Amino acid sequence: MKFLITGGTGLIGNRLSKLLIDNGHSVNILTRKIKNQDNSRLKYFVWNTSKKTIDNKCIDGVDVIVNLAGSSVFSFWTKSNKKMILNSRLDALSTIYGLMQKKKNKVKRIVSASAIGIYPNHKSKVYYENSNEISETFLGNVVYEWEKKAKIFRDIKIDLSIIRIGLVLSKKGGMFEKLLQLNNLGISSIIDSGNQCQSWIHIDDLVNIFLFISVNNINGLVNGVAPNPVSFKELQSNISSNYKKPFLSLSFPKSFLTIPLSLLGLSDFYNDVIGSNKRVSSKKIQDLGYKFIYPSLDKLK
């Protein structure tokens, strides 16, 4: 099969492109700057989503589009950054859609990234793909609009899969990398009670789920999370036991952080990302036959 990956030079895209090539597939990657072609089955093409420009050759012979494009949420949530976080996701989908309308192609499916940020925080509720509740937060709105935009591909008879991604465990990026960096400095931090539920997934499982969905023609929503979520405290404990043991453990009650977070404009970021508390189910992807490499944190040891 031939894949086109948007956001293919990012954390997930890099890992996914390697997996696809290792499994005998060909990969086209859309990027803002052209890169050297170092593999006969890996090609780069230039696009600019804000200007809606794209190299139309990127879609030649492509069977599946994997959409990972979007500005990182791990930034200060200023008004301009919030606008970029939303628009970068919508513009990427619009640019691909525009190309597919104009140029004849053989694309059968688009697998689009999403996030569990669409689900509201809750202490005990378990969220499945058919849950109708939408988080009334900035990130909840971003994910809702992101998924809504992806559904335009159904108008041109393209099968659509949407993966709601949890906290990605990777040493090379995301929140896990930030926690690991603190740990390597000898600091372990617990925010609030530390009991907030973290629905995580190892990056190797995540990219394998993208491949699994693509080759098995699975439509609709899928939660991209591991079967066994953990508390924030358990996540920190795992980092400490598997990596360098910290010499300083800090605990911050939420009330202590409220004013500083507000002054820094980080209240929304805390509620949506750092203080996230949601238990998300992996039952659907397991019932479809996917076997997790890392079903629980203890398997990471």
What do these predicted regions represent?
Residues 43-91:
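NAD(P)H-binding glycine-rich loop region in Rossmannoid oxidoreductase-like domains
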Residues 215-266:
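Mid/C-terminal beta-alpha module of Rossmann-like enzyme folds, strongest
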Residues 152-162, 166-198, 239:
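NAD(P)-dependent short-chain dehydrogenase/reductase
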Residues 180-188, 196-230, 237:
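Alpha-helical substrate-binding/gating segment
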Residues 123-162:
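Catalytic helix-loop patch of NAD(P)-dependent Rossmann-fold dehydrogenases
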Residues 94-136:
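Conserved Rossmann-fold NAD(P)-dependent oxidoreductase catalytic core, especially the SDR/UDP-sugar
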Residues 3-23:
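N-terminal Rossmann NAD(P)H-binding glycine-rich loop of SDR-like oxidoreductase domains
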Residues 269-301:
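C-terminal amphipathic/interface module of NAD(P)-dependent oxidoreductases
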